């Protein structure tokens, strides 16, 4: 017992995070989630200090750091760090590394969920600029695939040729976030681009490999570089800075809603198993409300005079 007490007094934040990353709980997460968790833990360590003794981190200290993250990096990032670190401390309590979770009781700020979508013209402007420059071509492919197939940027970044059947013109994908499997047809224009991309870059495994200094690398873009290049293309296209690449999935789903596509059919594309999970991607638009009113009128409701 005395040894355990001494151990708890000297264990550092870095040690706590490393122990969690070696755990079965962490190993069972999807690769994408593990990468995200590692990023948020790294952010916390960089701020609090790798060698900081865990016993010195109390709730007021955690609250101060949370407030700083919210101010400097934004509320969504602060909430991600808080959530992951709370998991780390809960795991450490379970294995006896510490007695407390300083992140469990801090006041969490709420943030407005993004509802922004791109117009078809804005998507077209972005792609036209991206495909004019060889250095931006793969980013253009990633964005076009995300828009056409309604998938997450992370999955499109790491998409391999083995995922696409040129004969059937079908994408077969196991999503990294929830392991959902989807099979999606493609459009003629995207298929033609994929054929051209394979002719030029099929010697390596990725559909949209990283292009650096005019050379094709046999690796995908990372999340940060994709965002940086995406902003460069957006600026070159003269598009508003409120638009983000991650909004492509929401844009695709919103277009399906506007077109009157049923929820089960949307879920077959998005890979969601729960209808509630689709709601954050859905947006109230004049097109969808007009269609709802039209259907109501056709059914004999609404217009009574």
Placement of each model-derived feature along the sequence:
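Catalytic-site neighborhood detector that most strongly recognizes the C-terminal catalytic loop/helix
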Residues: 117, 175-179, 270-295
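Basic, Lys/Arg- and aromatic-enriched nucleic-acid-binding interface segment
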Residues: 79, 94, 98, 104-153, ...
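C-terminal secondary-structure termini that scaffold catalytic or DNA-interacting sites
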Residues: 213-216, 295-305
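Short, basic (Lys/Arg/His-rich) helix/loop patches that form interaction surfaces
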Residues: 128-136, 149, 184, 200-203, ...
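C-terminal catalytic core of Y-nucleophile DNA break-rejoin enzymes
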Residues: 176-196, 204-232
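DNA breakage-rejoining catalytic core of tyrosine-based enzymes
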Residues: 55, 97-100, 110-128, 178-188, ...
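N-terminal core-binding DNA-recognition domain of tyrosine recombinases/integrases
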Residues: 1-7, 18-32, 39-114, 128-132
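Short, polar N-cap/turn motifs at the start of nucleic acid-interacting alpha helices
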Residues: 163-170, 240-241, 261-282
């Amino acid at each position: 017992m005395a040894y355990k007490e001494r151990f708890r007094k000297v264990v550092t934040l870095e040690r706590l995070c490393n122990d969690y990353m070696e755990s079965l709980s962490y190993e069972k997460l999807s690769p994408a989630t593990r990468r995200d968790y590692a990023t948020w833990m790294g952010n916390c360590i960089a701020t609090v200090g790798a060698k900081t003794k865990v016993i010195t981190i109390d709730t007021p200290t955690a609250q101060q750091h949370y407030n700083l993250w919210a101010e400097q990096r934004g509320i969504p990032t602060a909430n991600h760090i808080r959530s992951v670190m709370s998991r780390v401390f809960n795991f450490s309590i379970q294995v006896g590394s510490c007695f407390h979770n300083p992140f469990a009781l801090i006041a969490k700020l709420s943030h407005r969920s993004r509802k922004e979508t791109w117009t078809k013209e804005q998507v077209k402007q972005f792609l036209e600029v991206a495909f004019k420059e060889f250095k931006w071509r793969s980013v253009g492919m990633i964005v076009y695939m995300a828009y056409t197939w309604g998938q997450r940027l992370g999955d499109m970044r790491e998409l391999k040729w083995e995922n696409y059947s040129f004969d059937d013109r079908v994408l077969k994908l196991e999503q990294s976030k929830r392991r959902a499997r989807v099979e999606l047809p493609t459009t003629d224009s995207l298929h033609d681009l994929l054929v051209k991309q394979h002719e030029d870059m099929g010697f390596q495994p990725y559909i949209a490999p990283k292009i650096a200094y005019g050379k094709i690398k046999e690796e995908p873009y990372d999340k940060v570089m994709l965002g940086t290049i995406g902003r460069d293309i957006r600026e070159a296209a003269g598009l508003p800075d409120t638009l983000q690449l991650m909004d492509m999935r929401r844009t695709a789903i919103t277009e399906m809603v506007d077109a009157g596509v049923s929820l089960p059919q949307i879920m077959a594309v998005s890979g969601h198993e729960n209808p509630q999970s689709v709601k954050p991607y859905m947006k109230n638009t004049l097109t969808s409300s007009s269609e709802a009113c039209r259907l109501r009128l056709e059914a004999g409701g609404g217009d009574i005079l």
